[in-house]
Structure formats: C-alpha cells, structure tokens
Amino acid sequence: MAILIDSLSKFYGSKEVLSGLNMQIDSGQIYGILGPNGSGKSTLLRIMAGISQYDRGNVIIENIEAKNNPIEIRRIVGYVPETPYLYESLTPMEYFGFIGSIRDLNRETTERRTRDLIKAFGMEEYSDQFIGSLSFGTKQKVSIIAALLHNPKVLILDESMNGLDPHSAKIFRDLLRSLANDGATVVFSTHILEIAANVCDRIAIMKDGKVMAEGKTSSLVAEKNLEDLFIQLTSSEDIKMVVNALRGSLRNEST
C-alpha cells in the first residue's frame, strides 16, 4: 500500500476543513479525488505532499509517517499545485537544472530527464524563454516536468490538467498510465468527470472535508446518468442523491 490515511482531520482556526478522512491507495494506482471548490481536495493533497500539517489522525506515505517526517515525504513525492509557482526570471532549462540540484540528481541524469520530458511535452521552442513570458498552460508543463524530474514514487497533482491543450493533456494521461504501470502511485484532484473516467482506477468524492463515496472507476462510470450526478455534486449544496445513487455499487467494492 502506497498511501494510508487514518481518521485525518485538519482545522483552520475553529473551522474543520478535513473531517475524519480514511483512505487507502495502492502502489501503481491512479486515484482521482473529485469534488467542488472548498471540499478540501487541495488541503488533502498538500498534506499528502508533506507541505501542510494536520491536527488529528495519521498519514503514511510509502511507510513514512508524514507528520513528523515532512522532508522525507517531499523526497519521494512529486507535487504539482493548481497554480504554478515558478522562478519567472529563469528559463525552463535553468529552472530544471535548479530543481535537479535540490533533488540531488547528478547533471547527466538531470539533462537526460529534462531532454526526454521537454520532447514529450513539445516544449523545445520554449526551453530558453523566460518562464515569466510563457502562457499559463506552458507554465503548467514546466511545473509538471519539474515534479517528474526525480522520478517520484508518488505523484500528487492538484487540478494539473487545467490549461493544457488537448494534445498535451493526452500525452500527460499516457505518461501517468506509464508511471503507474511502472509502480508509481498517482493521486490527482479534478472536478471534471471525463478526466477522472478516462484516467483513474479509483475515485473518491469529497464534500465539506469528508469522503462521501469511494470506489472503482468502472463501477462509477457504469452508473446510469452519472454525468448528471457529478454536475449536481459540483454545483449543488444537496448531494444526498449522488451518494444514494452510488452507494449500492460502491459498498463492499474491493481494490
């Protein structure tokens, strides 16, 4: 098991933003977390990435307890935030060199990985331009490549397909599947059913800091009118019908 989350709770002041979450994610699995804005997806992913702390429960990533070992967690995790945070006065090539150095990669490995990933994402023409001059979608590619440089055991993506053109999104989906086939674990958030259905092995649905339903993607996609239900999930305050419609196929669903 790559990720174990046990009774996880997180507070901002007196507000509980994650409430008693339980989750198990296997190695080599692509796991999608769906839910509306404010459901707690980003907070959960930052905790998994070793960036944010939590108040109750436990989070174990690749047999490492996250709360007391954030540096060790960050060494084995690649994390891509929803909004790229990059050094915009550098070129992508300079930035990847910097990332390689802080990841303790030797120069040859950094250059080889950079070259392969730049080619895969069709970024050759942008590699020597200042990051600050690039479009949002191209910056997102830079952020993704940086997260992949050290070949992480766990890749955590927060709405990371936002801004990618269809061709790049397909390349990225194929790359995620290749990583999973090689044993890496991929966790990403989205509110778009189509992305989750095309990519994920399992899906969790979050609302108000809680997991409302969870199961195999094949079971979720098989549900009648699933797309309409997900639209209601992301736009309506009342999602009881979503949970009720899915509960039958999700209950006792094994990995």
Task: Indicate residue ranges for each PLM-predicted region.
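Conserved ABC transporter NBD signature motif
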Residues: G57-E65, E72-I73
